[in-house]
Amino acid sequence: MLFRSGVPALTGLPPGRVALVSFTHVRMPGAEDRARIGAWWAPARPADGLGLGVDVERADAAAFADEDGLGGVGFSTAERARVRELPAPERPAARARLWTRKEALVKAAGTGFTGDPAAVDALTVPADVVLVDLTDRLPGGLVGALARRGR
């Protein structure tokens, strides 16, 4: 389960300190970032000296359906090219995964988007960042990423 394995592994919190109270309520000491999609929550708390960011999205969200939506403005030329290499049915989920990476990276940096989201490179991870794809740990139809900055 994401809350019992992924978050403690990256934050250093013991698994018992991350509590899933219900599908809509998570208790985690000092949680400062969280992603919510429907009834699912993914909290994140940075340890001392670390930045932590998490994002979860629906793979079938309208924003990721084609390049005319977020895909046309939120992604770099290289990111759009990478998505175009995939079969058409896989492209919306690929856009959603790229977006969750971007969101996790800017949250871990503590900046949010300060300019053009296309300028945030979701294909190349900075040396001081650990980026984890959470998709396999989420219910079907959801994609997510968690980034930890600092050592």
Language-model region placement:
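Conserved nucleotide-ligand handling architecture
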Residues: 1-151
